[in-house]
Swiss-Prot record:
It comes from Felis catus. Residues 1539-1558 have a biased composition (Basic and acidic residues). It holds the Pfam family Ank. Interacts with CTTN/cortactin SH3 domain. Interacts with STRN, STRN4/zinedin and MOB4/phocein; this interactions mediate the association with the STRIPAK core complex and may regulate dendritic spine distribution of the STRIPAK complex in hippocampal neurons. Activation of glutamate receptors weakens the interaction with STRN and STRN4. GO terms for cellular component: cell cortex; dendritic spine; FAR/SIN/STRIPAK complex; glutamatergic synapse. This is Cortactin-binding protein 2.
Amino acid sequence: MATDGASCEPDFSRAPEDAAGATAEAAKKEFDVDTLSKSELRMLLSVMEGELEARDLVIEALRARRKEVFIQERYGRFNLNDPFLALQRDYEAGAGDKEKKPVCTNPLSILEAVMAHCRKMQERMSTQLAAAESRQKKLEMEKLQLQAVEQEHQKLAARLEEERGKNKHVVLMLVKECKQLSGKVIEEAQKLEEVMAKLEEEKTKTSALEEELSAEKRRSTEMEAQMEKQLSEFDTEREQLRAKLHREEAHTTDLKEEIDKMKKMIEQLKRGNDSKPSLSLPRKTKDRRVVSISVGTEGPVTRSVACQTDLVIESTDHVKKLPLTVPVKPSAGSPLVPANTKGNVCTGAALGRPGIDRQASHGDLIGSSPPTVPPPSANRIEENGPSAGSASSTPPLPNSTAPPTVQTPGIAPQSYSQAPPVHSLHSPCANASLHPGLNPRIQAARFRFQGNANDPDQNGNTTQSPPSRDVSPTSRDNLVAKQLARNTVTQALSRFTSPQAGAPPRPGTAPTGDGGTCPPVGRTSLKTPGVARVDRGNPPPIPPKKPGLSQTPSPPHPQLKVIMDSSRASNAGAKVDNKTMASPPSSLPQGNRVINEENLPKSSSPQLPPKPSIDLTVAPAGCAVSALATSQVGAWPAETPGLNQPACSESSLVIPTTIAFCSSINTVSASSCRTGASDSLLVTASGWSPSLTPLLMSGGPAPLAGRPTLLQQAATQGNVTLLSMLLNEEGLDINYSCEDGHSALYSAAKNGHTDCVRLLLNAGAQVNAADTNGFTPLCAAAAQGHFKCVELLISYDANINHAADEGQTPLYLACKNGSKECIQLLLEAGTDRSVKTRDGWTPVHAAVDTGNVDSLKLLMYHRAPACRNSLHEEESESVVFDLDQGEESPEGTSKPVVPAELINHADREGWTAAHIAASKGFKNCLEILCMHGGLEPERKDKCHRTAHDVATDDCKHLLENLNALKIPLRISVGEIEPGSYGSDDFECENTICALNIRKQTSWDDFSKAVSQALTNHFQAISSDGWWSLEDVTFNNTTDSSIGLGTSSVRSIMLGNVPWSAGQSFTQSPWDFMKKNKAERVTVLLSGPQEGCLSSVTYASMIPLQMLQNYLRLVEQYHNVIFHGPEGSLQDYIAHQLALCMKHRQMAAGFTCEIVRAEVDAGFSKEQLIDLFINSACLIPVKQSPVNKKIIIILENLEKSSLSELLGDFLAPLENRSTESPWTFQKGNGTSECYYFHENCFLMGTIAKACLQGSDLLVQQHFRWVQLRWDGEPMQGLLQRFLRRKVVNKFRGQVPSPCDPVCKTVDWVLAVWRQLNSCLARLGTPEALLGPKYFLSCPVVPGHAQATVKWMAKLWNAIIAPRVQEAILSRASVKRQPGLGLATAKKHPSQGQQAVVKAALSILLNKAVLHGCPLPRAELDQHAADFRGGSFPLSIVSSYHSYSKKKGESGAWRKVSTSPRKKSGRFSPPSWNKPGLSEEGIRIKAVSQQNCNRNASLSKQKSLENDLSLTLNLDQRLSLGSDDEADLVKELQSMCSSRSESDISKIADSRDDLRRFDGSRNNPAFSTVNPRMPVSPKEVSPLSSHETTECSNSQSKIELGVSRVKSFLPVPRSKVTQCSQNTKRSSSSSNTRQIEINNNTKEEIWNFHQNEQVEKPNQ
């Protein structure tokens, strides 16, 4: 059993294994685990778990059994119960054969095999289990995902249901719409079919219209050609009609000439019959308007009050009641005639006054000066009115704003009416009742203050005082004398303190030294012998010649503003009680105060105690002050910085008076203005500074007993008389200081009284005495700008570096005041410029703070005293050069002398001078500071701000450009061939501006700057006026009026590197320019080489549009002729158009050739044929057309006959085809046909304004381009060209219109236009000039003489010969038809020579010299260089003109033949003044008042004789030749042109009379009429007796008799300015007169043929 059991054991163990393996294999074969369902998987899992449990049991059993077998084998414990084990043991222990196999398998091996198999199976099962678990997990995950997906599915299902419902609704709507659209589609399809049908119809119609349009175009071109032909025919007819019209006009002028001759004969006959009755009435009329004159023999009874030039407003009725010399009683209400109302009868009646136009005579004071005349109802005598007729002319003072001057009676003109004593208007009986009771003291005072009649004044002029009435004392009644004196004092006081009744002062009138030095409202320095001072004791009389009393001048008064009510003006002639008017200082301008005191009645006259005259006291009523205290009241100058001559001038005349109260307070200084206004009468009378008189502030009486106080007062007032008397006293402390520390020297220096300062310094006053604030007299004078006082104090060793308590030095105070003279004096004295105040300010700070450029220049540039005179000009020029040129330190300019430490010095707040200038916007000062090389613009103040941070916009721009590169921008037009076709004066390059390139500038900014600069330049040169590039607001158009713009640019060169607008480099523009050392930016314009005309436009200044139009005409018509006056650039235009066409054709692939031929008088038709044939322009008919383009230019066609030269080619040129051949006859008798092909272009140039004669037949076969001088492009070409030249000369800057260069260019333009206009009016179109000759005008800044010299050369070389040739050729047409023009030109007649010279003289003065910018003296030097200027212009200017305005008297003026004048007394003439006469000559004169019957009669007779003589001359000339008469008419019509300037409207003063060289020895004049010598006497105003003598001598001379010419000028009237049978009416200032006398023996011809002579009917 054991054996069986043993043997069966393996089978048993093997069976399950095999079964399991078979099952596994079957399972693998039959099914797949992955395909099992869930239930099958569960079942499989349970089976596998059961199998695992069974295996575990088997394993345990086998382990137990193995243990038993092991024990048996090991320890011999055998179990005999098992026979199989025994058999096995026997078998194994048997034979001992090792190779015997056991009978049965070892259980251990079986167990191991089973165990190994089990392990494998376990691993496999564990693997399958892990896979099953992972699948289970995945399954769980999938379950969760499935649940989420199901939820989502449910949601989506719900949504889909909703969407479905919505879509269903939409679908229903879409279905409806589809149905509707389907219906519409059907309708649209039907419509489309209809439209397509219509479109086909329209296409057919369009094609038909296109055919018709092409046919219409062909017809239009044909019609245009016909129109061109018709226009040419019209031009021809117009020329023919114009010639006919000229003939008719010539006939008409002949008839008019006959009519005028008849009229003149009738007028002469009438004048011969009516001469006697016609002379009496004007005499009465004239006398009615004349104010009586005072001859030298008249007595002093004619009364003149206060001044000699009072305004007299009087009607004819008033004056008619007065005889010639009227003794007027002293009544205050009657109208009075001033003592010096003599008008032009006086020898020197014109007082030199800058800026006043003819206000030297009384004509404009009496009825001819509306701005200065009160209403006629105010018949009054102006107390301190404007002086208009002082006797001696004095040099005018620079103060152009001072009030009018007043002339004193003591300086009346010599040998004429002597001035009567002046009395108060408020004392009618003063003159009649004063002589009883005069004591010797009064007589002595009278003798002293009246002065000697022949004492020379300070200017050396001896003045005559009138013969005073002998007021010898007849009674010694002192009581009566005292009472009369008191009354007189009171009334004089009330008079001088009453409101002034005077006309408003004329602006620009300056006070003069003598003959009118008394200021209008400052004081009345009048000699009043009839008003005596009251005897207050027995001191000795003042000797008349005491030193220091009358020989010391007092300063003139600056302008004062009189505060008065206009309603009181009419009461100025009578006694008027006016209330006190004390204006506070705040209501008046600085330095002007006027206080009109109250007039006190006679009952309040003070009882003056007898005291010495020098002991001044004021009574309680305050009515009288001693004459010594008030004899001289100095003027305190207005504190105006930069005055050329402040009030410390020494040019004023001193005329001490007995009682001279100041009618208004003198201008006070700023310090006195601050203290308040004083109402004291003493202040009103003397002008005493209120700051020195605190007791007078209340208006009550102030004792003045103290001598030091009197010294202060005299020094403050500038009272030299009182001051000298006080200084002569012993024991007087001249260094006494008042409470504020002001010494007398300080007060005198502060108020600018140079004479007082000199007296005090000579007396030993301390020159460096300081006041409480530490200011010395030098500080006070420098602070007020009194440079005379400063110079005097410096000469007395004043401390120039003295610093006040706050550290202000005199230099600092002068800079603060802006006084250039004081600064210069201090700098020359060697003052220290670096002294600082307590606030840290230097003089540079002070100068910059006031914005005074001149002061800053002096501080920075003033070096040595040697350059004192020329310093300012050099500095200003150098500074301007620096700024304009943009260079930091150009060679030759002065360098600043101040160190950089002073310029960069900072004050207490850290501000430098640059901070101050930048913050206040003082750009000029900042520029001067920036020119200093050591300026630190980045320096910061204590708030860390630079000058740029606090600067205004302008100053910021200046500071930003401080370190910028200034690169000139130039425009280049390429190479211009030298001498090519009139382009000699064209420039290749022109500088248009300077580009400021800063470090932060980008390429976009640079591109915009270049474009803007080009646009501005093109706009500027094509504008009408001188406008700055910055000031002009140009429109947004890219092209200018000449058609140029940024599109005209071909390329731009940055140095030598090409660049295009918008291009950017890696470097910035600033770095690029620095690295490449680019010194300029050049803009190249497109030219003919590119097929463009932009460069031609810029070179010639012809608008681009017109050049393109010319090019179109050439390409369209093939035959074009350019014609115009000589010098109209015809050749240049033709050549440039040919070049442009050539390059265009070459760009299109054609070959092109330009053939140029110059036509002269010998150019024959055969030569032209050879030219046409050789250039292949004229080809045989048999030959086919060539593709080569030929451009033929025929120049100077005016030198040949067009009809002879081109007559046979007209038809072939117009119709270029084989159908219009031209037959050429060869020399051998054969002929050949040629024709012009379409590729040939013919251009011609003619230097002639218009065609004449047979040449008109050629006109209709060519396209003519007329270049008129008065139309574009020639009209504005010269202006644009010269403006571009000026811009180039000024390095791109446009100068201001007032710059001399602009005036010179404008003058050249005016010369060209006026010259052509006059030549056109003269009927000589062949003499017209184009602008070419004027293109070479030199533009030299500051040297207008070069331009005038160039003009003289042009006139002599070109203009004058052309004019002479044209006039001679015209005169020769009628006179010498058989001899020809050449003979007439070689041998002109005397009449022709005279006409030529007259024409040249008129053209020279009318068109050339008129408006010349040179000063008068320089123009006189250059005038002789002009040929033809020696003809006397009075010949053509001695004819009359008519005016609508009547009412002028015969005024006496002199006429100069000069074209221009610059006189100090008269304003320059206006040639085109709108209010002047349209016809003839209108002479401006001042009406004459002081002439009597005899004078007027003599004038009329001499006038008639002169005019009859000119008429005879006129007839003699006209009888000689009719052709010359025509030219004469042209000359006179040219003179009387409305549109042109008038030759007679030239300078009208004797000093400005022009005398041309060669006028004395002129054969043309001496041979025509040798019987007329002209007196070489100078024309001068005549007195009455001289006029009478002249009239008596002249009345004996008959008409036409040879006699000596009268030296009286011919008076002219606006009504008839011809033979001077004039209508006499009221005077006017709008007339001028003809100068007859030229100081040469010349003949006076009257060229005016058609004058109408009127006889006087009044």
